[in-house]
Amino acid sequence: HRHVYDHAVRMVGVKLIEVETRAEMEAAINARTALLLIFGDAAERGEVSVAQMAEIGKTYEIPTFVDAAAERPDVPNWYLEAGVDAVGYSGGKCLRGPQSSGLVLGNKQLLQAAFLNGAPHHALARPMKASKEEVMALLAAVEMWVRRDHEAEWKEWERRLQVIEDAVADVESITFSRHVPERSNVSPVMHVDWDAEKVGHTSAEVAAALSEGEPRIEVFHHATGVSFNPYMMEEGDDSLVAPRLREILTTR
């Protein structure tokens, strides 16, 4: 398997058949095919687009599903507009709701079938039931999402990154770059890189020091630096991260 999410599909009793092209997808379809599944973030980088998968599904009368767990649940939903039957989102990523919750949007008949497989019904998903507290918390998160000023939120994310950058901008050899992921975890991400010999710490050492401090600060690290994603930071977190990063980078 490639990653643990493959098992989330296999656990319902199906066999995964991986394809790369439209021809391979159509050739793999038979009377036992239960679902066509695609990872939304990677769809446009592959040879089968979301719209093409949806078209094939309708042609062969097979349900289609997009895993968009880390994406923004935008309205109107472009996956549903592309023709897929259902799309799933995490309740705990962009929505900032309970980590153990999620949303499935789409065809009412399919959603009803999913509902019948979970609590309060005694079916396959009974062990993974969401509590009533999680359901209401996710509903609140969705209501907050549609009311949120996303443009102002983005500016706040940029400000948080700037606070961190300003705190270490004078460290020898340090450089900064930013990028925005295409679909999943969409927010401005800042890469902070440096020459380990000049600073005296490798990226792995800096990441470990941040993680082992108080409070713990978790970052991604790569060969020459670390990365900061502000969209999971709470108000004031930047004022904790910035001095801690400076302390580590300037202490030998």
Name these PLM-found stretches.
Residues 167-247:
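Conserved C-terminal alpha-helix-loop-beta "cap" of PLP-dependent enzymes
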Residues 146-180:
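Conserved PLP-dependent catalytic core of the aminotransferase class-I/II
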Residues 1-147, 165-169, 230, 244-247:
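Conserved PLP-enzyme active-site core in the AAT-like
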